[in-house]
């Protein structure tokens, strides 16, 4: 999911990214990431500026409110992951495994990609973008959560057990969508998404150094 946009310029320009050096791959992906961030900012600049001003006016309360909803989503994720571990003891989410491999290869780039790029782009697309298209609150929440979860899982499915990971990913997506409907402020879900991803990558990096 993180690197999807980077393939578009490569297809248009007929670039073979796999032939790039490691440094070349990082620079290419960083350039396309920054370009996509700029495009989304231009498209949603009015919403982003307005929501940022409103969010920072009462930053402490807004963060506390958003944190409570994120915590519920994390609890659901933990419970569902424990059930998956019980059913398939050696299983690991394909998306998580792919991200771990990339972290091992390009740690600094992946910290930026996971902690900043992904929350910004995914919240604007899966929360703001979908909400603009679907007016019914409940249909929007389910649609946003299911699409978010599916795109994090489907591309890495290799066994039927991998489909079980739709539950934790969709539950987190539903949590972020519900949070956005409650606050009508994209930074509520964006900050919690960034917190979630940063904690995840931080714990992984700490674990690999112990």
Region locations from a protein language model:
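Alpha-helical transmembrane segments
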Residues: 1-4, 68-76, 141-147
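Alpha-helical transmembrane segments in multi-pass membrane proteins
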Residues: 1-47, 95-97, 109
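Alpha-helical hydrophobic membrane-insertion segments
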Residues: 8-9, 26-42, 63, 75, ...
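Juxtamembrane helix-loop-helix connectors linking adjacent transmembrane helices
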Residues: 14-24, 48-118, 210
